[in-house]
Amino acid sequence: WQPEKPHIEKLIFPTHSNNEQTTLSLLSGKLDWAGAFIPAIERIFVDKDPEHHHYWFRDTGYSTFLHTNNKNPDLSNVNVRKAISYAIDREQVVRVGMYNYTTPAHVTSLSGPMSKWHSPEINNKENWTAYNVEKSNELLDSAGYKWKDENQRIKADGSPLTFDIIVVSGWSDWIRSAQVISQNLKKVGIK
């Protein structure tokens, strides 16, 4: 089959449990290609040999998602979920968690070249992916979550409004993004 093409005897696909292993394999010459997040790739890889070391990272479509447990009575409230969304500074998530490799996704998740599929009236709808702490606080206030003090919101029963963010271990982009989101939520009294 395709005799004019180079003959490749074998391909090796190593598995790594974290991006540190992938980065070390890349830097030691054990990898020719990797489909993984490499922090600070310009500085640690490309700058070492700009003629031969390259990378490509989609500027859109790579999204960090929060999947909520809607069996949790607090998260089953759409206004709480919207408040959480408004409280997230996606520019900061991209800058800190994603090393500016990408851009914040559109409210539809159809960003960049995929934006051609937006319905024309979408821009007139509520943009709950916009960073808006004031709107987040309004939604939480209207949902009945009062401030216990300047740092913590409480539920009607007096218990603190808290959620756990569970994130895959070993992948610094996800971990750092979750840390940013956690810090953002503290600004609206969610711990």
Predicted regions and their residues:
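Ligand/substrate-recognition segments at binding pockets and active sites
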Residues: 10, 115, 145-191
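Flexible loop/turn segments at secondary-structure boundaries
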Residues: 19-21, 63, 172-174
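Ligand-site clamp/hinge motif
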Residues: 1-44, 179-183, 191
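Local pocket/hinge segments that shape ligand/substrate recognition
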Residues: 5, 35-139, 143, 156-159, ...
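Short acidic, gly/pro-rich beta-turn/loop elements at beta-sheet edges
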Residues: 23, 76-78, 173-175
